């Protein structure tokens, strides 16, 4: 299934350290040559300060069991530099500990003023940012987050390093699996990017990177399944970035919609986008939805669902969703089939769901028992009779709000572009006589 593996593409938009979990995940699969994969990991880790990880990778490649002199010397240099940086920031960190329990920590401006007044602190000489970066390169992500948090408190959003700190903080929180904090940092970074004075190309690049990083957060946070749909499908700027720069992200958006039963209203909009982008990107997951909701090809959907399982099993981002995806995909096939045939035989249904008749009957009974399906089973005839299942007022309201929100953002974007064009034209006109 190397044809459907997105690791190579995804790694292009991730920080070097964020690629290591993906690469290690692939080592447990049989998609690529293990020797070549380990050699690539070694090449990548050599660009960091993670000497122990480098040595471990060398052992896995059977290069040597003892650390080469070059690595011994490099490790000593890394530790010396780390100690020097820690000594440089020690006075400020000590002052921060003293001020933590006081009133000044309640407000960042007051906190910075207290540091400047009592400890002669200058934001321009912020060594903590360099220490945080160095700790991060050493793989000490937890300690790095503490210094990055301090930087965000004392830095102005106009600081030249502020954006780098935002990216670093998000990466470190992801790598320490702090999903709640990572989501907060993701939201803060997105707001900064959306409101920054970037050129069109710069904004597109920043959003493309953020989209890839956010997938790691969304599929690990309890609220992520709703948030990924809202951001990728209903925020025009991000949907445009996906369509322009990374249509392969459709896999993750489609997966989120399939496993999110409360957002079935998003299916119609998702299918439109899948059809629009089908000439640039297709995989078994998007093709499954096309078979089911565009072509009503139930046999094709059944075959694609089998392929989807292999794709998900080998995708680091969504492997944890495998069982849920299969369950919800079967339910989607069932619901769609029942819209066309109000009364169906269990044997026919079992064939469409790739299940044995007794398994299919038990599966339907559980759906009815858990109040997820309005239907009745006639055991004598072996029939399933569907009842009507109207859309709840809440879902209707959510659908209308999403639609209005998307249209509002689209109009706001048009107005902003026209305003910029007008300003540029006025600026050009004012210079035409010179």
Swiss-Prot record:
The keyword Ribosomal protein does not apply. It comes from the Eukaryota. GO terms for molecular function: translation initiation factor activity. One of its GO terms (biological process) is formation of cytoplasmic translation initiation complex. It is found in: Cytoplasm. Residues 218-391 form the PCI domain. Its main location: cytoplasm. The keyword RNA-binding does not apply. PROSITE patterns: PCI. Coiled coil: none annotated. InterPro entries: eIF3e (IPR016650), eIF3e_N (IPR019010), PCI_dom (IPR000717), WH_DNA-bd_sf (IPR036390). Keywords: Cytoplasm, Initiation factor, Protein biosynthesis. GO terms for cellular component: eukaryotic 43S preinitiation complex; eukaryotic 48S preinitiation complex; eukaryotic translation initiation factor 3 complex, eIF3e; intracellular membrane-bounded organelle. Component of the eukaryotic translation initiation factor 3 (eIF-3) complex, which is involved in protein synthesis of a specialized repertoire of mRNAs and, together with other initiation factors, stimulates binding of mRNA and methionyl-tRNAi to the 40S ribosome. The eIF-3 complex specifically targets and initiates translation of a subset of mRNAs involved in cell proliferation. PANTHER family: EUKARYOTIC TRANSLATION INITIATION FACTOR 3 SUBUNIT E. Belongs to the eIF-3 subunit E family. HAMAP family: eIF3e. Component of the eukaryotic translation initiation factor 3 (eIF-3) complex. The eIF-3 complex interacts with pix. Interacts with mxt. This is Eukaryotic translation initiation factor 3 subunit E. It comes from Drosophila sechellia (Fruit fly). The gene is eIF3-S6.
